[in-house]
């Protein structure tokens, strides 16, 4: 039994968070660009979103392995539900990015307009830990 920590778990979590932060930052930059160029800019971000999904799945596997080494089987399902939700949100993001890049009617990310507003004197134009950690923009 190792007490030094699970470096596979730590690396996979770090890779997932770092990639998610880069994706959020680049999505904001793409949305702040010229409206006519937004679809192509989002299309170029699809590989980064897919990279995040890959890291998220690696973290899921590493977390499951760590859990079974150190805990009883019950209890894991609550974390599995959360991670499955995060995975599905990411897959939906990729679908929406593809639709926007293909200029499908009704596609886009109008919620980013709200995100980029200055609220209560706080500049919301950068990714914050709270939005990233809780995977929504309303926190």
Indicate where each model-derived feature is located.
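Catalytic domains of carbohydrate-active enzymes that cleave complex glycans
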Residues: 1-139
